[in-house]
């Protein structure tokens, strides 16, 4: 097939997107496809025409545009199938505050939060005790994620976040280990337990620098905990109206309680990314994962794959 690989964009996660795109590009060619890279580095001008000249679009955008549903909406307009979730589910999952409302309504445990549409002022404090995490309401890859332990740190973090623009969300820091679990098709994959080796939490450097975090897959957890993680990941995927694949991030407390943090609709696809590790744990190679995502994308759009 003629595949348009859409990567790059103008968000702060541009470099991560392009890094992952290199591996995806190679995998698509190994699978026999003709691949063209489209990088909407400043605008989406030309995307509609480029997509219509191809049989399929493979998205590897992070943040905005891409995870917010805009590119998906344009592809729907072009009538070109693509992998992953549609416009509505993508927008909902990227908006962390809105997604947490969905979690609560569907009985999925998530830390309490305060949504900040604008800077609340230098003297503002949250209605819960420190420490807390404050982050962009519409970003990913742990960019602009701050752990704050006092009013002074909070004030500095707020200034930095709102200098970048956009919205923020703050929630109490739940102590425990980080666990992530992907969904592929209609099944949850084996979860991964994450132990950052430098930072106290899974920040941007830990996520994308080899050797900065210990990632254990399958996670060495009791069977009932593993089952609950997979159940919650699948429930969150369905509650948000997602399709194809996703990855849910959790905190597991020392008492064994789970807190759902967020759901990613376009999980990372770099050499250190989590979803490919989970797929490998059930015997799916990286190329096999890319091929499966294409199959799921075609099926979601009522298409069948022809020979490459």
UniProtKB/Swiss-Prot annotation:
Task: State the Gene Ontology BP annotations.
Answer: cell wall organization; peptidoglycan biosynthetic process; regulation of cell shape
Q: Which residues bind Mg(2+) 2?
A: 262, 264
Free-text remark on how the cofactor is bound: Binds 2 magnesium or manganese ions per subunit.
* Catalyzed reaction equations: 2 D-alanine + ATP = D-alanyl-D-alanine + ADP + phosphate + H(+)
InterPro entries in the record: ATP-grasp, ATP_grasp_subdomain_1, D-Ala_lig_Van_CS, D_ala_D_ala, Dala_Dala_lig_C, Dala_Dala_lig_N, PreATP-grasp_dom_sf
One GO MF annotation is: metal ion binding
In terms of superkingdom, the source organism counts as Bacteria
User: According to the UniProt record, what class of enzyme is this?
Assistant: ligase
**Where, in this chain's numbering, is Mg(2+) 1 bound?**
249, 262
> What is the protein's major site of localization?
cytoplasm
Q: Which PROSITE patterns match?
A: ATP_GRASP, DALA_DALA_LIGASE_1, DALA_DALA_LIGASE_2
Pathway(s):
Cell wall biogenesis; peptidoglycan biosynthesis
Compartments it resides in: Cytoplasm
EC number of this enzyme: 6.3.2.4
Required cofactors, per record? Mg(2+); Mn(2+)
* Entry-linked Pfam families: Dala_Dala_lig_C, Dala_Dala_lig_N
Q: Which residues belong to any copy of the ATP-grasp domain?
A: 100-295
Residues annotated as binding ATP: 127-180
Q: Which GO terms describe its cellular component?
A: cytoplasm
Record's keyword terms, sorted? ATP-binding, Cell shape, Cell wall biogenesis/degradation, Cytoplasm, Ligase, Magnesium, Manganese, Metal-binding, Nucleotide-binding, Peptidoglycan synthesis
Q: What does the UniProt function comment say about this protein? A: Cell wall formation.
The record's section on PANTHER family has: D-ALANINE--D-ALANINE LIGASE, D-ALANINE--D-ALANINE LIGASE B
- HAMAP family associated with the record: Dala_Dala_lig (MF_00047)
Q: Which family does it belong to?
A: Belongs to the D-alanine--D-alanine ligase family.
Give the protein name, as stated in the record.
Answer: D-alanine--D-alanine ligase
Q: Which gene encodes it?
A: ddl
